[in-house]
Amino acid sequence: MAKRPLGLNKANKSKKKKLDSAEKAEKAVAKEISPENDESAEPAPALTLDADEEDDMGQLESLYKNWTSSERDSPRILHGVVHECDSLLQKAKGEGLPARFHEIYAASLLDLAEFADKKKPVKKKKVKSDDVAPETSDMFVDAALERVETGLEQYPEDAGLLFVKSRALKQDIDEKMSAVSKEERKETAKKMISQLNKILEVFKLAQKHASTVTPAQLDVVEELIELSGALESVVKQSDISETTLVACEKFYNEILASEKDENTVKKAHRGVGTCKMIVADSLLDLLDDDDEDNDDTVELAKKNLKAAIEHFQKSETDEDGEFMVTLAETMIQYGNLFETESDDQKKWYGEAVKRLRQAQRLGVGKYDEMILELEDD
């Protein structure tokens, strides 16, 4: 059996997000945060509003669509969306607003959090009564959670609201883990594990009530896999990511069994492939630690790698060079588990080389040295 990983970045591995240190998170704000603090000198983006001027929700939907179809590199449109939500809220006095209104409002607040500064670690100190706290990302997340809960009080089975809630709870974990001191980090991570389980339950409920699942909604599942690995590394509890992985793979497989949208299906295939790859990775680590390769471990690693490749190939596109590198890495690892110079090894190294050449043509990176090494083997 040949040497394992040949030097590529393991893009197929679940990336463990860095959990910064700081203080405990603030309590949820009582009111939604005003969007009118954007001091950017950028010109206002061109907007296309295709709804009747008398149709308030239609106007909001149209404005929000401008945001979701934009480059998302500036909060200007988002501020407009939130301002429109505030106006509708005042006009309706909180009554008669549809579930979609609350969904757009909460989702926009979560997106605004991405543009706000993170709450920085500070030592505990007395706060003067005239101190004004700057708007930080955790405040937007808290406001989004409050908004989505308001919507769910009226529409408890609305899938869109439930999907946004799962995303908000996930972002809340990120905020809390980035707002604790080094000393409190482990204890906070332990508390976040229960919230991780809650997110899985909320997503499961959303999936149950949804007529369809979008690729964007599936992002939460991918992020949960990454987050579980990060929490596991903090609390040193080995079953956190495994439990999450099983649940997430089940979500992906259920979507593959029922979803018709091509983009969602491709994303689900990548999700299953990622889950299989993570399992294989842990098995490869065991093989690296052992002086002699255990046949059962090798076969189990092969099984998971083969499954990962099959799912990855079903989601492969000619334009996604970065994913080609991920697939090539998986094929190399699979080829490494066969006898050196065997037909199987040559086959999978050859398939990997094809992807690396294409990725290089697309400008993803330089892989000439890796390609030469694979072709020499």
Swiss-Prot record:
Presence of keyword Protease: no
Transcription regulation in keyword set: yes
Principal location class: nucleus
Regions that span the bilayer: none
Cellular localization per UniProt: Nucleus
Family recorded in the similarity comment: Belongs to the ETT1 family.
Protein name (record): Enhancer of translation termination 1
Source species of the chain: Yarrowia lipolytica (strain CLIB 122 / E 150)
Lineage: Eukaryota, Fungi, Dikarya, Ascomycota, Saccharomycotina
Originating gene: ETT1
